[in-house]
Amino acid sequence: MTILFVMFFTAFTGGAGLYFAKGVLGDTAYYAQFANFMSVTQMISLFIAFVPMKKWGKRNTLMIGLTIMAIGTGIQCIWGNNLTMLIVCSVLKGLGGGFAAGVGYGLVADTIDYGEWKTGTKAEGVGMATMTFVTKVSAGFAGAIIGWINEMGGYEAAVAVQNAKAVFGLKVSFSYLPFIFCALGFVLMIFYDLDKIFPQIQADLEKRRENKNK
């Protein structure tokens, strides 16, 4: 479920970004600036995510990532009208998002191993299928909700200056909802304890496989 919230965060941030740049900052050209900073930072943190994972485990690394994402989005909720602050927030969101993405596939794989440990059946191919499904669901959900919020706020693409209700709606889609997704994901991870028992799970599975091959 936490991975779904991370996907929602990404989908809303990307889906509402262009609307936000035009409706709040006044120019769609600004979107490329803060979006590029986020993408580059996320790519870098994705490649170094193994460092905190090795030191603190997948659960704690994801919680660190969610915290950094929440800080970036929280600052954005307050000072999102300022391009410089928005770029700073984008760097923070990219840093945290890279950690979250780096952990995501690992958590799905661990869950599959846990299922095999509990049931004796390994669900081959479920990991990639799950991530693909979650990505599609989050993108579709985000697109629908962003469109609905824009419609409710009276957003008009052809208008240079949006009304106050439309601007608030853009902030909801681009800042407030992503912040809530980070918070919900963090709360769920508090109750995640698979990291603690996973070494035993791996040992048990290895023993079963050895016995099966004898």
Which residues does each PLM region occupy?
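Membrane-embedded alpha-helical bundles of multi-pass transporters/translocases
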Residues: 1-214
